[in-house]
Amino acid sequence: MKFFVTGVGGQLGHDVMNELIKRGHEGVGSDIQEQYSGVEDGSEVTKAPYLSLDITDKEAVKRVIESVKPDAVIHCAAWTAVDMAEDDDKVAKVRAINAGGTQNIADVCKKLDCKMTYISTDYVFDGQGTEPWKPDCKDYKPMNVYGQTKLEGELAV
């Protein structure tokens, strides 16, 4: 299968891309930087095709995903500086990336009938439950701005 992986400059995207390639899949990575800026560890992700993409730019998302023609998208890109996301001057940017960017990717995947996997976070729950969360649990209680915007991303998918 051919995968398009967002956020390969971060830990999650880096590891997802390496695992896909290790399993014999074709992978195209992306992140906001002009060139790959993740860990230069010589692993497969550092040698794989890479495209710069600002996921908050709806037209760019459409153009890039249409050009890659993936069988599936694994969306790992996110604003992950949890504490900094609480700063009043950062909230709009965090929401634009985690919710709006995810919406942009989901819209294109739907239009192209392309599978999409979205990686969220446990911060969409408050951690106060007394029993394990069930897969279809809707008892959301985001802990902070990061959790709220990742939940908005979940709902976009």
Regions picked out by a protein language model, each given a short descriptive name:
Residues M1-R23:
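N-terminal Rossmann NAD(P)H-binding glycine-rich loop of SDR-like oxidoreductase domains
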Residues T6, S30, V73-A77, M116-T121:
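SDR active-site strand-loop-helix element
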Residues D15, E19, V108, A156:
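Rossmann-fold NAD(P)-dependent oxidoreductase module
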Residues K22-G38:
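Conserved glycine-rich Rossmann-like NAD(P)H-binding loop of the short-chain dehydrogenase/reductase
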Residues S43-K58:
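Rossmann-fold cofactor-recognition segment
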Residues I55-I97:
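NAD(P)H-binding glycine-rich loop region in Rossmannoid oxidoreductase-like domains
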Residues A92-N104, V124-V157:
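Catalytic helix-loop patch of NAD(P)-dependent Rossmann-fold dehydrogenases
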Residues K111-C114:
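A short helix->loop->beta-strand "cap" motif at the edges of active sites that frequently abuts
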